[in-house]
Amino acid sequence: MRYAVFIFLIVLIDLIYCWNSKRSFFIPDFLGSGDGTPKSKTESVIEERMEYGRMILLVCNKTCAKHRSDIPLWLKEFNQKKGYQEPETITYYYHTYRQAVSFIDTNETDVFPNLIYFIGVKRVVFNGDVNIREDVNDWIASLDQLILLEPRVYEDLNVILSDTSNCSSKYLLLADRPKCPQPSWSIVARIAQDHGIQPVKIGHPLDGLTHVLLYKRMPYLSEASCHLSVLLYENSYSDFGDDINPLVVSDWITTLLPLEEGSCPALFETYWHPIVDELTELQQIFYSAELEISERNKRPAFVLVGLTGGIAVIILAFSIFWGLNGSGFNKD
């Protein structure tokens, strides 16, 4: 028993340390040395771009002027066709392969020149003919594919929240609110997809009933938080908080999701909360009305009426006091 408690404390300390040192800790295994220090300029570039975006690396073992001209042009046209802006844009970099480096696995890389795609803590090697534009474009398109759920009404989102009871469905709820945009949300969505998690984009502003659904069925979510990034699994949810760094999210997904052994593997309860049962019609009506009253009380007109009424009461009190002070209360 003591040994089990000791192991639990070690894991907990690791996770806390991991959370408090995000930028330096969440470096992919194929980058840098054991202490996380990059060994080359290319490694530094990969790490920097993967922190919030993604990139394709052209690797040549000798001069390849034509490929260095063609590949960035093809990639630029692909990005323009998709209408991508940073950080969703797939960026480009070049590396001459002269000696062994951590980000090139010779067991995966069959030929040179070659292309390697980086996103989160994942890399994918092309191993095709980089001279054939159609093949390169098809490869990029397959990596770029994003299957996104966008619930439009209360019932759509309600079904998603209830769909993890079979211990196989996994979802990541994301939002990109106008008042606090999250530019990397699509990168995070693709990372989740690579882990077998269905990304879900929640539209804003939320209607009253959908707002009630989110914060009543997941009561530990902070309504004051501007961002939304919530992992759903096994009738439970885990809130990533406001910092949606792709490298952090990728590492946290692998940390939070257990190795699937059996139908319903145990979750690390410290970071998970149970999703509350579906709301009854009466609860929907009550909580929606409660929210409407709360929102109305925040409006300037209601605040002004309350303030004016308060000042009027104070003035009336002073008038009565001075009136009494000058008449019956003054016996002299």
Swiss-Prot record:
GO terms for biological process: potassium ion transport; regulation of muscle contraction; regulation of potassium ion transport. Glycans are attached at N61, N107, N166. It comes from the Eukaryota. This is Putative potassium channel regulatory protein sup-10. One of its GO terms (cellular component) is plasma membrane. May contribute to coordination of muscle contraction as regulatory subunit of a nonessential potassium channel complex. Its main location: membrane. The chain crosses the membrane at residues 302-322. May form a complex with sup-9 and unc-93 where sup-10 and unc-93 act as regulatory subunits of the two pore potassium channel sup-9. Sup-10 may regulate sup-9 via sup-18. It comes from Caenorhabditis elegans. The keyword Chloroplast does not apply. Keywords: Glycoprotein, Ion transport, Membrane, Potassium, Potassium transport, Signal, Transmembrane, Transmembrane helix, Transport. Residues 19-301 are extracellular.
